[in-house]
């Protein structure tokens, strides 16, 4: 392929020919990378064989026009979502205005000529995402940002669960809190529970069954076999060990829960098939369709294959005949293991029932947001989703990030990207299904790496991340669908837009009503001064930190830098500069606290002489509570003065990511006078500044 033809093919496929590097300079993408990415993509030209694209999205109330390709006259028929049918004729090459008024939703336009017909999905969307009435009225709310697996309690089985979540909602509501923000609850790998990253899931449509509160499952309570197992010395010993462990022992917890739930499942099966629970479960299975069936089959097959240590990495490690859900061997297994599939479907039903109950409870407590979920940027290569739908995912590429100063070879996240051309060919149904699954039963959805709506850095298989390129996604269409589903499910949207984000996506997100994320550590002006509380944008959520960053105490004591040096994450000459930079950040933050009146005038003015104390902790929380952001998210780790991070980006085996528990139980946290005093300050401060921009 000649140079001009190669570049044009790359442009047609959405592959950027250059990008802005860490030095602010344009850097060209190599021809090798262009060819490699073109080879793994679906052909974007296939959609051009139809007179109209497979889908068209119209946002707001402007003109809704399409210009059909080809020649001559077509007959058209428009079937609205509500069942109304309209028809007429149009001429190729001339703008065709859709008959109106069309309500917001999903409609179907069919063109026909002779014996041929073509269909286009018409999506009519609002311009902006949903906003809860309380926030629309100018109220400022706060809540807790919780990694659910870290929660300790006197009742759980060694990992935070939906029972703990329910209690957390009660505790927060009593203290003026409005929501609990959660880590991704996506399905992981019950058969390989040690693969615990919530950001490398098996499916973004289904839940992680390890969060089921087994003690609250009726069939566990009513099963004689389950109760005998539960009361045995062996079970109680294993439970105590898992509960008292400093880190989450995923394998031990999952083994306990699966053993208990097998007993409960046997009891459920023996019950009257006409019971309300059986009808509810059957309806759930019908609604879940093939997606749920093959998620369940995948979990069952993976568990069966765990005995062979060479097959523990998911389907890529399985024999060739098992690497796709539609292969004959897999279909035969499914036919022979219907009961096993039903068991895993039942676990998904239990998880959904319990999570839904938490949402309902949050609403009865008067919370305007209640729960917010987190949507990971992708699924792992060896996931149930890629196994069941390999056409949608480009398995010979991976998502990552271009080189920066701390990562000269870039980042490879090991997540195969969705092909934007396949998404479009399917009328964006995979994206719609994913949003619906994650917006269900919650008041807000956080989208991790929200820049993925605009572009993703694709890395060809076998290459380092510096050999990648940006691939464009249909951002206007995706934002329109996001707004439509947001309104339908009454779920506001938060975009994780940290780091270097193109101004293009920043403006689009703001116009679409997507909330920005403002992390205290990053809110410094060019002169290094921290942004004043009143200058935070109202359309944002503020926080001190995130799961990828040091805790408040860890930041102040610079423990994250010491840990990074120990783990070999920083070049030797960078560590000293990082400590100097941190010292300057601390001084700038202390200056900001004094300027905002968050600290008494007589208190220490030099950061180098100040250790983290309860008074300083309260001052930082008071500063955050005073920000004009409509939402404020606080981490329990910071209430407790914890120093160790829950995740260290850039590590795999060097650090026990996703395993560090909170230092106190839920019961102890909310009986702690310091914690209650701090939360009282936060709640009062938020209520005192309700009016804003």
Region spans (language model):
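Extended acidic/polar, glycine-enriched regions
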Residues: 64, 72-141, 157-171, 175, ...
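Extracellular ectodomain segments of secreted/surface proteins
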Residues: 41-71
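Long, contiguous interaction/targeting segments characteristic
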Residues: 1-50
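Active-site-adjacent substrate/metal-binding segments within catalytic domains
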Residues: 142-148, 153-158
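Conserved, well-ordered alpha-helix/loop/beta-strand core segments that scaffold catalytic motifs
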Residues: 344-376
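Alpha-amylase-like alpha-glycosidases and glucanotransferases acting on alpha-linked glucans and related
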Residues: 191-352, 378-631, 637-639, 653, ...
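Short amphipathic alpha-helices and their capping/turn segments at secondary-structure boundaries
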Residues: 131-134, 166-174, 359-364, 431-445, ...
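Structured C-terminal cap/extension of enzyme domains
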Residues: 633, 641-691
